[in-house]
Amino acid sequence: MNVETSCYALNKPFGVLSHFTDEGGHPGLGSLSLDLPKDVYPVGRLDRDSEGLILLSNDSSFIHELLEPSNGHSRTYMVQVEGDVNSGQIEALKSPMDLRIKKQVHRTKSCEAKLLPTPVVEDRIPPIRERKSIPTNW
C-alpha cells in the first residue's frame, strides 16, 4: 500500500503549543483551523512562548532523518534577551553546559552563538517586550 507523503511549513504563532491538542488551557496547533490531513505530525517542537518555522509531515522516515541527533542537522534560533550581552557570555553560551531537568542532569552540545543586529520583525500579539530602561540584544 503506497501512502502519499506530505510536508508542510507552518509559522507557529506565539502562545500555541507544538502539538495538535490543547493542554493546560493553552491552544495547540489543532486550534489554528489548518486544512491538513489527520496523519501529519510536527517535526520537532518550539516552546509555547516561541514562534517560527515548524515542519509538519506524515513521512516517518523524513521525520526520523531530521530529528535523529546522530544525523547532525543544525537548527537556527534568533533569541531576544534582556540586558547588555558581552563576549564572555557569548563564549559561555557556545560551550557545553549541564541542565537539570526533573532531577536529571543533561549535558548540552557546543553550539555557535553571535550577536545579531536588531531584526525587523512583524508586530505580534502580545507585542515583543521592550522596556525603555532595560536594553535588549538578539
Model-predicted regions and their roles:
Residues 1-138:
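RNA pseudouridine synthases
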